[in-house]
Amino acid sequence: MEQKKLFLLDAYALIFRAYHAMKYSPRFTSGGMNTSAIFGFVNTLEEVLRKENPTHIAVCFDPAGKTFRHEMFADYKAGREATPEDIKVAVPYIKDIIRAYGIPVVEKEGYEADDVIGTLATMSRSRGFSTFIMSPDKDLSQLVDPSVKIYRPGYKGQPAEVRGEKEVCDVFGINRPIQVIDILALMGDKVDNIVGCPGVGEKTASKLILEFDSVENLIANTDKLKGALKTKVESNVDNILFSKKLATICTEVPIEFDEEAYSRHPVDEAAIRDIFGKLEFRSLLSRVLGDKAEAKPTPKPAPAFGELSLFGDDMTDAAAAEAEPAPTEHTCKTIIATDANIDELVDKALSQKTIGIHMVCTAPNAMDAGIAGIAVALSPDEAFYIEATEESVFDIIRILKSETVEKVGINLKFDMVVALNIAEKLAAPYYDVAIAHYLLQPEMSHSINRLAEIYLKKILPDYQLPATAKANKFNPALSLEIEDIAKVACARAAACLELKPVFDKKLEEEKMAHLLHDIELPLVEVLADMEHTGVRIDTDALAAYSKALTQRLADIERTCIDLAGIQFNVGSPAQVGEVLFDRLKIDEKAKKTKTGQYSTTEEVLEKLSGKHPIVGKILEFRKIKKLLSTYVNALPELINPHTGKIHTTYNQTVTATGRLSSTNPNLQNIPIRNDDGREIRKAFIPDDGHSFFSADYSQIELRIVANISKDEALVEAFLAGEDIHRATAAKIFHERTEDVTDDQRRKAKTANFGMIYGISAFGLSERLQIPRSEAKQLIEGYFKTFPGVRRFMDQSIEMAKEKGFVTTLFGRRRMLPDITSRNAVVRGYAERNAINAPIQGTAADIIKIAMNRIYRRFDREGIRSKMLLQVHDELNFDVVPGEEDSVSRIVKEEMEAAFSGTVPLVADCGLGANWLEAH
């Protein structure tokens, strides 16, 4: 007899996991609806159905409203962030999909999904089931027994994990899974607002339960504890016992175990086709229905905010109703180059006007990678693959270096860096389909598989590594046979070639082709050169600074303990809250709930900084600790052992505004406004004997506001060369410029920059620490003084509502589908973006133009100095001796010439022995 296998899915845990897994490459319908959560959940469901083949299955949801735990504790889950609007929209679709699969949706008013799962799992034992609870949440581990296991779905390439009794006990360091409740009772759960025993983490909790078996036994034997731990437990007995009640999953929910309903049923093909059609899940439709998915009309896509098409056009009913074929498997004639045919193939490629390319590399990090091979598409239907050998690499280089053949690919910056590793280059002309798509849909995924599916209606083959294969640790794909590698690489090269005319047409229609050809594509080469050049770090200086900061941390901790008059862990938010509000009574309004802990976020502490000297010390402690972990101790770990430099990666297709971002390290977040942060910049140094040069745009965003708004008073102040913040203060406060006080200038400066981000009276009052009425008057005075700025803000919001996007001065678009959201918070965020995106996006365009101009001029004039870093509105260079004057002149000229408006740009420059001195 077949073993009955029951899968119980924790719906919301899987939905949130799917949503956040695709946070940086979300999926959207052509109507602008974010389908990431739905797509991820359905993929997970499909995977478990196919791989595990359960005989019975149910999906459990949390019901709307409160549960019995809220009756026990009113603030249960009070700290949870609001559910994202995209998930709220997704849930009804997910429930419809589950039902279309013939799977029951189970929820019970007054109980959480965990309780429903616990009850069904308990009932399944007596019915002979082998039960698997599918969830990433640790709480459910308390239910594990010989017939119930936890099934943790795979994540980020990792396989699914099944945890039985032994595995749960090993993970938590306990003897029995039921003791997970005791672990949670001690360590608490911030997400659910279960405080536990403040100051006791998971490791300590595990040790205590391993020794005492339960929290009840621990409480009865606190005389065996010592020091601070003894004090913590004894002073939190009620909290611990109450937390255990909250953490215990109820296994007696009043529901029936409907074995027939939970058994597998056929998929409702019509319903699946209808729902997947609306969501534009074409590849999923093919996977679920197979051949039955073919030759059916695609339903009208699901509506979303603004009813925008994939490219932002108004979507007509006729266009929406037009039948679209489901994606089919990509087919491409694939030839593998041999000694006999390689010359003919390469010559044929070099005779083309345009080819598609896809480079296969030996490592995921460009600076460590070599060329393993290259696929070249002669047409969308024919491609060849050259495996890199000592002889064939020269043929590959011939293709890359061609200045007559346009090379169309994806993520070409990576390929350029790899080519530079062998002192070669991928020469212009080239075309990157990810960048082209980024201009059209900046917040969508730009992966080649996704682009091919959406625009070509093709499913590209992917690398399938057999479970028994021994993977290449640098690039698992290289463990495959050359035929398999060639098939995937050639399909990608062919898809790139086929995508180019699709994107070119749309870019021309949307009048954005110039952004691609004049700004973004030329920048690829600039960024590749910067990444490959890298920057030196003074490790000795950082080591000394680390030692000094560590000593300061110890000194601050001692000072805090002295000020508190009690021993406590300054790094523990829970203990800090107890000291500030229970012992020192700094804020009488900071009421402590029955089992909650005080909020000691930076925002909270900043408001209290004037009430007691310990608050400032705690803030200082946290800033130093973050500085140490994020930069001082982390930067040396990022040094490439072969070059001795840090090679940051610039991301050209990530931010919605058009700004560049960087990773490993994130240069954009290096602090500069305090002495501690500036010491980090001091550690960035030029090559031996060279100088460090820095150039920074002066108040570029305010200058852009003046140019966009054409506000007469703002333009006049800039053209007069006045201190813009002092001039603003003089106008707002009706003072002569020379009579403006420092405090008035400070307020005007905050208002100037706050307006760019659509700051409210509440926000301004918080930032300036002034009454809201005064902040309101300040804002009213600002807009009375600068009516053109108010007009620009209103017009930007109206444009967003009308078109679904706003544009920079250069025509770059920021899509704003939430501008008509019914949720006031979500809509307000979109309105602030409507104001800020044209400003920030224009600044991004300008710095990119400047980088291109400087790079080309350096090349024309034979300048050997190198551009190293781009951070916000600042460029940094390694300057060869004797080129100081030339670099200073060229950089300043080209940065200021990058944009011509009524209010000119100004670049401030500096030279020094390191980044700090230069800046």
Give the label of every model feature segment.
Residues 1-61, 65-77, 89-96, 237, ...:
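Extended, highly charged clamp/arch subdomains and adjacent linkers
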Residues 2-4, 24-28, 78-255, 453:
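Extended two-metal-dependent nuclease catalytic cores across DNA- and RNA-processing enzymes
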Residues 6-7, 17-56, 74-75, 79-86, ...:
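Conserved RNase H-like, two-metal-ion catalytic cores of nucleic-acid enzymes
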Residues 75-89, 145-174, 230-232, 384-385, ...:
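Short alpha-helix plus adjacent loop in nuclease-associated cores
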Residues 175-202, 237, 256, 260-265, ...:
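C-terminal or mid-to-C-terminal helical accessory/interaction module adjacent to the motor/catalytic core
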Residues 236-387, 443, 451, 471-672, ...:
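Conserved "right-hand" nucleotidyltransferase catalytic core of DNA-directed polymerases
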Residues 475-478, 532, 640-643, 647-648, ...:
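Conserved catalytic core of nucleic-acid polymerases
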Residues 551, 555-558, 562-616, 784-836, ...:
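C-terminal polymerase-core module
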